[in-house]
Amino acid sequence: MSRTIMLIPISAGVGLTSVSMGLLRAMERKGVSVSFYKPIAQPRTGDDQPDLTSTVMSRNSDIKIGQPMSMSAAETLIGSEKMDVLLETVVERYNQINKDAEVTLIEGLVPTRKHPFANQVNAEIANTLGAEIVFVATPGTDNPTQLKERIEVACSNFGGTKNKSISGVIINKLNAPVDEAGRTRPDLSEIFDDADHAKQANLEVMQIFNTSPIRVLGCVPWSIDLIATRAIDMAKHLKAEIINQGDINTRRIKSITFCARSIPNMIEHFKPGSLLVTSADRPDVIVAAALAAMNGVEIGAVLLTGGYDIPRELVSLCKPAFDTGLPIFKAQGNTWQTSLNLQSFSLEVPADDKERIEFISEHVASHIDGPWVDSLTEGAQASRRLSPPAFRYQLTELARSANKRIVLPEGDEPRTVKAAAICAERGIAQCVLLGNPEEIKRVAAQQGVELGSGIEIIDPKVAQEKYVARLVELRKSKGMTEVVAREQLEDTVVLGTMMLERNEVDGLVSGAVHTTANTIRPPLQIIKTAPNASLVSSIFFMLLPDQVLVYGDCAINPDPNAEQLAEIAIQSADSAAAFGIEPRVAMISYSTGTSGQGADVDKVREATRIAKEKRPDLVIDGPLQYDAAIMENVAASKAPNSPVAGKATVFVFPDLNTGNTTYKAVQRSADLVSIGPMLQGMRKPVNDLSRGALVDDIVYTIALTAIQAGQEQK
């Protein structure tokens, strides 16, 4: 039997959309099938505009989403005393999306001056749908007693705290900066220069838990990253003319500085994520911003006012700085008018800002009560699919429990530094950065990254000498001498590999700068393959909208023979099982079953036979065409008796050309996230990165490596 949860805000400005996204993510992490419904649209501007939460959900997830009624239609029915008609429409649309869901999440109306009927309508909808009520509140400047009283007042509108339908409350924006009236304002006043001096309640989580009249289901701390908008969104709001595009689509604004002072008094504000607002006739500010950019500081953007043009000579002088990605745009009007326009900028997350939506979802989900989320599926059949959010959550949890040390030879590479900081902050792994300590700290400062506990920095020049003798011993049969060993140890991948060989670290991740060959060659020479492995292969985890698939081998073996292909299939199946994916292995070919002949398909057929013989416990079939392996309707006609066709989770390709082409085609055409390649068959875990890897790619590769290290010791 499915359950219905209704989120009801006790006031305006509680961050309802963020809580909805986070609660959905928390349930998806557990593999719960969810649907979402906002009965009445409530856009910030214009009563007949699309609803924000529904739009965000529809563009960024594959869950079923109910069609909201427009606010004007709802107001007409309420004004005509036709609440019964409104509720019948709500029930009709609710029934369209809750049939196959274990949990349906309902988002209630926010009580505002324009919508004073919100509490009444919320109560009627909750009662009609038999929903369990979860209030959403924000403390503002309340002390625990005042917050308790506000929650009690909210409960009184729904039958009081003894109402068994009230499940609890989620506290959002804990310890956020607030204005003089105690409101957490949804505009840029939160990130102006004086934000550091704004009032903060500084409530302790335990105080809230101890005083709340109902169960606290989550306490979500405020973070500046939750409202860090893209530079392009700011430019669009101001209808600004773009002078230099740069990284305008990806740079984030975390603070705003009006450059009215002299340069020496503003240097501290030239920092990552800052929007520098200056009159276009202040060349000193523009040049100072250019110097900061040339030094690696990722300033959010420069906003010019006053209607002046930048002199051509100045543009030419600053061009190298502009080429670093520094966005520059010009607003009409003077600085005062621009300031007023900025105040009206909405910090609601745009539906196309996938990066921020992902951060908000993960941040909120991480602060929702886990046992309560687990309880939502009691009495309902658990979903067997492993969704991408569930898989990513499982990765981080398994990595945390493994608690491993991972060496990163490219320790001064900016993406690697960021990833290491994230891993340390989340407890994913203890990262060891190889590189000049001063250079690493400089790169971290430029990126606005703090290198706290959980990160160790090792200077290669200091550490190299102690590995010389051991490297000579290991490679003596290949003619290794002390002179050559010292030369090779100048390569940080070789140094990291020696640390791994000496059990000083548990795994190695490289490749953001190094080629695949340069990353893999030293471990193959020094670490070698696992005792039960005849080769090293790789897999990618492909995060489809509703499940995670494994593709192998798409990175290492150009043209494996039948024996090698069988080994790749077995390795890939074991890796899938280790990461919570039930392995159903499809051996891919251009032909299904016995319909085709030729050397290529015969190789796949023989590999399938060998794999079955070696591992009769595996569910494996082949040769299968890709469509027969993944689509049930095709499988029904092409391979009706196959235990794998139509429901394969592990896809083993006949050669590197086929595998790599398929992986990239699926990833790019479907705009999917993939994690990998993860190497299999090494005696100790070593993983290679793509040189185009994003920070998140590196984080999850570190997590994979930590998990592999934990499994090696079992």
Swiss-Prot record:
Phosphate acetyltransferase as annotated region, ranges: 390-714
Top-level EC class: transferase
SUPFAM superfamilies cross-referenced by the UniProt entry: HprK N-terminal domain-like, Isocitrate/Isopropylmalate dehydrogenase-like, P-loop containing nucleoside triphosphate hydrolases
One Gene Ontology biological process: acetyl-CoA biosynthetic process
Localisation: Cytoplasm
Pfam family, one: AAA_26
Enzyme Commission identifier(s): 2.3.1.8
UniProtKB keywords: Acyltransferase, Cytoplasm, Transferase
Similarity remark: In the N-terminal section; belongs to the CobB/CobQ family. In the C-terminal section; belongs to the phosphate acetyltransferase and butyryltransferase family.
Domain notes: The N-terminal region seems to be important for proper quaternary structure. The C-terminal region contains the substrate-binding site.
Stated role: Involved in acetate metabolism.
Subunit (UniProt): Homohexamer.
Protein name: Phosphate acetyltransferase
Organism encoding this protein: Vibrio cholerae serotype O1 (strain ATCC 39315 / El Tor Inaba N16961)
